[in-house]
């Protein structure tokens, strides 16, 4: 009951054990029927890391086994060496940024609104009033008043009244209609494509995931690095012919689709230059085999810029230029098996960069791209000046209202000046300095925790620390009064907890030390006879409570990478039998606290007496002394952390009532003072495991146990976040554009100028420094391994990029020319994240034929014209994988054979283990920006802009002439006197 629990020993397997070591890779056979799953071999010792053997075909999954008990973890399989990374393909040159379209001319000003009508004239002043009646005649002698004389004549009209105040201003006339829109400005020509920014250094390599579930198909043979762009001449035909592809290395394991072929620069057609290196925009080629590129061809002539074509579509747009003849392939790395995923290998150094091929001659310019998008309409021109406001005339006498003044005419719009010539192209801007290598990408997120490996071997439980001798049971004092309850000292010793299965690195649990203030409730010490509870001294049979064996030093937190193998769950120590509670005597009167007697040897726990009623709660006595800590038990091997046993119920603390009379136990004598702690004797046998108390604090970590062999690989974590792309170096300054002359009269759009010839290729940027490898992320879980797809034949060409490719010379003999001198590496493009596996296409036919021998380095032959596209070859049977020969010298680029029709996309092969990510190179410097092309003729006049705001009110018109005086009215009749 209290002894060791041997459940930690290996039990019959419940979960699948680790995979056995993989055998060497066989040649790829036809996919056979999946074999049955082999038996699991016993775990071997961890071997030296072997070379990764080829992956065997994956057997079908067996029926799920019963959950066995955890087996012993087998050794981790050796880590295969990472395959050599293919050379990075060159990144296509980025199309130049187009020049901005010319701004449309300002629209003609809208006509001015007609001035409002002149306000009505004021009313004429009143006529003079009729004069007052003359004085009455003198009275007659009889005093009678004579008749009132006739009214005097109407006084003449008074002077004209002041002119009436000007009538209110006429309302503003309606806003003139917006002048007709001027014709649209000519479409801005498409600017020259901007120079591609320097290729940023590739983001840090994503972590290599362990291979887990079927990864995506192997990394594409790294696409050959694009040849470094030659110094950019003035971008000539914007779409140069595709440069020769570098020699391609042998296909790596079928990877996911390679990056799209470099995009040719779309542009307007320059005159056809000699074929150059930039390819017509390729469809996404099959995964290019990376190879070294051929030697740099002479730069093409620098043509004037063609008109700007529409920007080529990304990626899949044109057909990739014919593939260069296949140079000697670099040896394909042997495909490592997707073995057990070992821990990720250290990143291999990046394979040597292939030398960049020389840029081929500038290819014929593509046709002129369609006109660029129309420039945006110019802003509305300023509103024409309002017609001059007439001067105010003198205020005449008010006359009849004059006619409304004419509306002021809108001033005529001046003709637009002729456009000045475009300034000569400014000198090419210098290349921007190489940007510093991008920051190291953020470390990928932590991979998800793989499934726990099988538990490590369970360490044998260390010997239990010797249990101190049990003190002798003190004699039961007479139950004095309940002393004040001491702080709950260590509760009666929890019998030394039976060792919980050797808990991982916790050393064997020594005797439980004082669990700090109120230690976890141990077994509720026997409420035994509630003796003088004074100090809950070493009640019960526990000797001095040993310290809890120091919890083994917790192994350092493993890297949080792969989750450490979860050791076996140690068996939870069985709970010792709970000591039976002593009988609680009936509460007696609280006696005085007796002296604590010496602790006698612990007697066996008596049978539980009936629980006494609660005694009175005495005052809290002083805490008993802590027992000495027993020596720490030897640290067991770290097993997996035992599962936590269920926490035993915490003994209920009875209400401490008044101490009742002790029951069947004799009357307790007063507790004597505590005797000195006895020396720690040899550990008695472990007591029964009490119910687990509350967990004590974790002690200092014990020494790490022996690490069990690694478990099978965990499930692959998610791929770490891709590091941010390195900063792009600053783009070289664009040559300054000469100042534009004044806009010319809008003419018909002239024909596009002749495209200039392509400028010489820019010089290659320096080879980037390798960035530090990114941190490897945990591998994703390995998926089912698909059969490797046969590399598809070259697919049919997609639509050509804008502009037909110039004719290429006839293709030379198909055999590889002797390798030329390798060009320098271009900057590696950043790796895109691995593409998802596409739906498997039909398997392309693999052309038969062995690669020709690598010739000695010959001079590069001239590019022949592009031959007609070859038909699909019949699918040869895949030959057995030969061993990789040494890499031959890179031959010069042979003439490109005709571009084969693009085969159906091969089925995606398994994603091979992810090769080590090469360190990112520094971004090459930009080629110089080509000079801007000449300004095209001014386009037609843009539509009129919106009308401007209504003009201010016109000035008041001159007053009209004073009309003739009206006819004098007839005299009114005399009013009554």
Curated annotation (Swiss-Prot):
Residues 641-650, 902-913 have a biased composition (Basic and acidic residues). GO terms for cellular component: extracellular region. Residues 17-66, 138-159, 205-226, 268-278, 322-338, 373-392, 497-514, 526-536, 569-605, 620-640, 658-668, 689-698, 752-779, 787-797, 853-871, 878-898 have a biased composition (Low complexity). Expressed in bones. Glycans are attached at residue 91. It is found in: Secreted; Secreted, Extracellular space; Secreted, Extracellular space, Extracellular matrix. It comes from the Eukaryota. The modification 5-hydroxylysine is found at residue 91. The modification 4-hydroxyproline is found at residues 10, 13, 28, 34, 344, 347. It holds the Pfam family Collagen. Keywords: Extinct organism protein, Extracellular matrix, Glycoprotein, Hydroxylation, Secreted. Its main location: secreted. The keyword Transmembrane helix does not apply. Prolines at the third position of the tripeptide repeating unit (G-X-Y) are hydroxylated in some or all of the chains. InterPro entries: Collagen, Collagen_Structural_Proteins. Residues 1-977 are annotated as: Disordered. Residues 258-267, 300-309, 441-450, 537-546, 678-687, 735-744, 798-817 have a biased composition (Gly residues). Belongs to the fibrillar collagen family. These protein fragments were extracted from an ancient femur bone collected at Cueva Rosello in Peru. Trimers of one alpha 2(I) and two alpha 1(I) chains. Interacts (via C-terminus) with TMEM131 (via PapD-L domain); the interaction is direct and is involved in assembly and TRAPPIII ER-to-Golgi transport complex-dependent secretion of collagen. Type I collagen is a member of group I collagen (fibrillar forming collagen). This is Collagen alpha-2(I) chain. It comes from Scelidodon sp. (strain SLP-2019).
């Amino acid at each position: 009951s209290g002894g060791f629990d041997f459940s930690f020993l290996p039990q019959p397997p419940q979960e699948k054990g680790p995979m056995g070591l993989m055998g060497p890779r066989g040649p790829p056979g036809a996919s056979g029927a999946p074999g049955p799953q082999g038996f699991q071999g016993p775990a071997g010792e961890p071997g030296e890391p072997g070379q990764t053997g080829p992956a065997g075909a994956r057997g079908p999954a067996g029926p799920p086994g019963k959950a066995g008990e955890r087996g012993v973890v087998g050794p981790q399989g050796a880590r295969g060496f990472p395959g050599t990374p293919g050379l990075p393909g060159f990144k296509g040159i980025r199309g130049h940024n187009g020049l901005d379209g010319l701004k449309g001319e300002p629209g003609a000003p809208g006509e001015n609104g007609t001035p409002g009508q002149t306000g009505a004239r004021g009313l004429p002043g009143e006529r003079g009033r009729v004069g007052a009646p003359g004085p009455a005649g003198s009275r007659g002698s009889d005093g009678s008043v004579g008749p009132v004389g006739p009214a005097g004549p109407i006084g003449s009209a008074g002077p004209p009244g002041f002119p009436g105040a000007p009538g209110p201003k006429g309302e503003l006339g309606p806003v003139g209609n917006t002048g007709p829109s001027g014709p649209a400005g000519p479409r801005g020509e498409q600017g020259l494509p901007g120079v591609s920014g320097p290729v940023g250094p590739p983001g840090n390599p994503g972590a290599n995931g362990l291979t887990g579930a079927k990864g995506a198909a192997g990394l594409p043979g790294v696409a050959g690095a694009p040849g470094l762009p030659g110094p950019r001449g003035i971008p000539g035909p914007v779409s140069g012919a595709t440069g020769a592809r570098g020699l391609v290395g042998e296909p790596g394991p079928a990877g996911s689709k390679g990056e799209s072929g470099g995009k040719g620069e779309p542009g307007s057609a320059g005159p056809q230059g000699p074929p150059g290196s930039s390819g017509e925009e390729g469809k996404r080629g099959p995964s290019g085999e990376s190879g070294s590129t051929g030697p740099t061809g002479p730069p093409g002539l620098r043509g004037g810029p063609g008109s700007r074509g529409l920007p080529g579509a990304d990626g899949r747009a044109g057909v990739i230029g014919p593939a260069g003849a296949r140079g000697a392939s670099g040896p394909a790395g042997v495909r490592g098996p997707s073995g057990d995923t070992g821990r990720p290998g250290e990143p291999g150094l990046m394979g040597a960069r292939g030398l960049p091929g020389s840029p081929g001659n500038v290819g014929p310019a593509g046709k002129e791209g369609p006109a660029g998008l129309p420039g945006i309409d110019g802003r509305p021109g300023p509103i024409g000046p309002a017609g001059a406001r007439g001067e105010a005339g003198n205020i005449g006498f008010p006359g009849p209202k004059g006619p409304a003044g004419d509306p002021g005419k809108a001033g005529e719009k001046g003709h637009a000046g002729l456009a000045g010539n475009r300034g000569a192209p400014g000198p090419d801007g210098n290349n921007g300095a190489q940007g510093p290598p991008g920051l190291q990408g953020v470390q990928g997120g932590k991979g998800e925790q793989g499934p726990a490996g099988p538990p490590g071997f369970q360490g044998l439980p260390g010997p239990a620390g010797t249990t101190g001798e049990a003190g002798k049971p003190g004699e039961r004092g007479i139950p004095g009064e309940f002393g004040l309850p001491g702080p709950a000292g260590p509760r009666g010793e929890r019998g030394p907890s039976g060792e919980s299965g050797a808990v991982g690195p916790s050393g064997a649990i020594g005797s439980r030390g004082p669990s700090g203030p109120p230690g976890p409730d141990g077994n509720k010490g026997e409420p035994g006879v509630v003796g003088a509870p004074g100090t809950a001294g070493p009640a019960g049979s526990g000797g001095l409570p040993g310290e809890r064996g120091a919890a083994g030093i917790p192994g350092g937190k493993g890297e949080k990478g792969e989750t450490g193998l979860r050791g076996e769950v140690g068996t939870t120590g069985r709970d010792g039998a709970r000591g039976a509670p002593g009988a609680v005597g009936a509460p007696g009167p609280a006696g005085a606290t007796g002296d604590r007697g010496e602790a006698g040897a612990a007697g066996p726990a008596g049978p539980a007496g009936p629980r006494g009623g609660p005694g009175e709660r005495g005052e809290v006595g002083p805490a008993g002394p802590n027992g000495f800590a027993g020596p720490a038990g030897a640290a067991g091997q770290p097993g997996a952390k035992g599962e936590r046993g269920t926490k035993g119920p915490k003994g209920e603390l009875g209400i401490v009532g008044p101490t009742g009379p002790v029951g069947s136990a004799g009357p307790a004598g007063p507790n004597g003072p505590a005797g000195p702690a006895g020396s720690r004797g040899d550990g008695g046998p472990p007591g029964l495991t009490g119910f687990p108390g509350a967990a004590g604090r974790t002690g200092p970590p014990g020494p790490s146990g022996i690490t069990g062999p690694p478990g099978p690989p965990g499930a692959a974590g998610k791929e770490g976040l891709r590091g941010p792309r390195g900063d792009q170096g600053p783009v070289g300054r664009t040559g300054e554009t000469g100042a534009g002359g004044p806009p010319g009269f809008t003419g018909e759009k002239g024909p596009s100028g002749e495209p200039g010839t392509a400028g010489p290729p820019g010089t290659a940027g320096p080879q980037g420094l390798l960035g530090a490898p990114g941190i490897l992320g945990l591998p994703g879980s390995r998926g089912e391994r698909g059969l490797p797809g046969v590399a598809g034949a070259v697919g049919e060409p997609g639509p050509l990029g804008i502009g037909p490719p110039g004719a290429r010379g006839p293709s030379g003999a198909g055999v590889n020319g002797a390798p030329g001198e390798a060009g320098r590496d271009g900057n590696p493009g950043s790796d895109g994240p691995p593409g998802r596996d596409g739906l498997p296409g039909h398997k392309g036919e693999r052309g038969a034929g062995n690669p020709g021998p690598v010739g000695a380095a010959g001079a590069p032959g001239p590019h022949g014209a592009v031959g007609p596209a070859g038909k699909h070859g019949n699918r040869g049977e895949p030959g057995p994988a030969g061993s990789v020969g040494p890499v031959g010298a890179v031959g010069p680029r042979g003439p490109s054979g005709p571009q084969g029709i693009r085969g159906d996309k091969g089925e995606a092969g398994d994603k091979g283990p992810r090769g080590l990510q090469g360190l990112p190179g520094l971004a090459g410097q930009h080629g110089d920006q080509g000079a801007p092309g000449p300004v095209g003729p001014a386009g037609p006049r843009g539509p009129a802009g919106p009308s401007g705001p209504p003009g201010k009110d016109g000035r008041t018109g001159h007053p009209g002439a004073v009309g003739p005086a009206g006819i004098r009215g007839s005299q009114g009749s005399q009013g009554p006197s």
